[in-house]
Swiss-Prot record:
The gene is upp. This is Uracil phosphoribosyltransferase. Gene3D superfamilies: 3.40.50.2020. Its EC number is 2.4.2.9. Pathway: Pyrimidine metabolism; UMP biosynthesis via salvage pathway; UMP from uracil: step 1/1. Keywords: Allosteric enzyme, Glycosyltransferase, GTP-binding, Magnesium, Nucleotide-binding, Transferase. The lineage of its organism: Bacteria, Bacillati, Actinomycetota, Actinomycetes, Bifidobacteriales. Uracil binds at I197, G202, D203, A204.
Length: 213
């Protein structure tokens, strides 16, 4: 597993405003989108490209374009949807799949899959899993293996905040045959007894969309 933690003043500034409990949902959503675009720049560094002959107004040249098959972006519902706009603005030609998973509250590292909209065959595809929080690591491992069962071998997770416990769990449980990377804005102190990241930013889904009772 390869872990990349962004180190940039713009990331630190935006993340501080994002964490603030007084930041309204509208601003929170915009900041998530902006942070994801900054993360995606690093996460997409190894996207496959092919030669593309073109003509500029001055002369012919050979540039580069994204190769086929197209990369696929997979938000983990529901909080991952808040990161989708930033990703598709950067890679508008990417395909989008959806994966609904939620943590079993009695067994925090176990997941319940309740929805999926994914191609049956992900062989040869570069996959980007997006979910704001890497807390226990259970969702990320389950989602990655879900993609791997469909043939994915190149998976990059983009999370805004991670907990050390979650990173450790992922390192210990991810299938080593997968080319797996994680890009985060920050690694926080720890998880509390409710498996929330500390200091964290609260429940990302609730802050993006409001609380659903």
């Amino acid at each position: 597993m390869e872990l990349h933690v962004l180190n940039h003043p713009l990331v630190e500034h935006k993340l501080t405003v994002l964490r603030d409990k007084n930041t309204p949902s509208s601003t929170f959503r915009e900041l998530v989108s902006e942070l994801v675009m900054l993360e995606a720049y690093e996460a997409t560094r190894n996207l496959s490209v092919v030669a593309a002959p073109i003509e500029t107004p001055v002369a012919p040249m050979t540039g580069k374009k994204l190769a086929s098959p197209r990369p696929i972006i997979v938000p983990v519902l529901r909080a991952g949807l808040g990161m989708l706009d930033g990703m598709t603005r950067l890679i508008p030609t990417a395909e989008v799949g959806f994966l609904g998973m939620k943590r079993d509250e009695e067994h925090p590292t176990q997941q319940v899959t309740y929805a999926n909209r994914l191609p049956e065959d992900l062989s040869g595809r570069q996959c980007f899993l997006i979910d704001p929080m890497l807390a226990t690591g259970g969702t990320l491992v389950a989602a990655t293996h879900y993609l791997a069962e469909r043939g994915a071998k190149d998976v990059t997770a983009i999370n805004i905040i991670a907990a050390p416990e979650g990173i450790k769990y992922v390192e210990e449980h991810i299938d080593p045959s997968i080319d797996f990377k994680v890009v985060v804005c920050a690694v926080d102190e720890r998880l509390n007894d409710k498996c929330y990241i500390v200091p964290g930013l609260g429940d990302a889904g609730d802050r993006l969309y409001g609380v659903i009772d």
